[in-house]
Amino acid sequence: MRYAFLKHMKEHEAHAAQRGLGLRTYVVGSEGEETRLEAERIGHHYIEVDNKPLGAKFNAAVRMALDDGVDYVLIMGSDTFFMPSLWDQYRDLINAGIKYVGIRDLYMWDWNNDDARYWEGYGGDRFGEPIGCGRLIHKSLIKGGLYDSHRNSSLDASASRRLPKATVISCRQDLLVSCKEELSITPITRFPDAERVDHTMFLPLIP
């Protein structure tokens, strides 16, 4: 999955450029030389950071991008794939001056058994809160660390506490999909009420 994601993001650099957006991919790995070589051969920026605590690892990725002079940081996990059309939504909101964009919903696909589902997003007290991946955040909103550095879980909530309310969009048409396994931090089995969908619609997304 890792190499497929690296190729996927390289393709998205071209898709973003077609829409007038400059995209650079920053990879923060903890697997050593093999991952570094994979990332750098494709043309991505790479830094090695311990996998735990995850909060410190995520903060290192954000800091690497900010130190390189980017205007926005896009948070995307290495298990996530999406259609190029998502850039149309991001471009329009960037051009409108929006500083924080989030995605409210998500597709999930367990590669082990082809269980695929569509989740509409948080309800109750968390209604309207964006999911973790796909958050597009302007540099002016990031003061110090974006995440609690000591955390290995609840990272999305720790970032939300530091940020204003997001302008939230849907990925239903853009097929943002998180490829899950039972060993994932948030396995697909935690969403028993999510709508079941046909996994084959995600196949064209995987390089």
Q: What role is predicted for each listed range?
A:
Residues M1-Q18:
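Short, well-formed alpha-helical segments that are part of the catalytic scaffolds
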Residues A4, R19-L21, G55, I98, ...:
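Catalytic phosphate/metal-binding cores of nucleic-acid and nucleotide-processing enzymes, i.e., regions
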Residues A17-E33, I47-N51:
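Short beta-strand/loop segment that forms part of the nucleotide-sugar
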Residues E33-E40:
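Acidic helix N-cap motif at the loop->helix transition within catalytic regions
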Residues N51-A65:
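Glycine-rich, basic loop-to-helix element that forms the pyrophosphate-binding segment
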Residues V70-F81:
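Short beta-strand-to-loop acidic/aromatic patch adjacent to the donor-nucleotide binding site
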Residues F81-S154:
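Conserved catalytic core of nucleotide-sugar-dependent glycosyltransferases
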Residues S149-P207:
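C-terminal catalytic/acceptor-binding lobe
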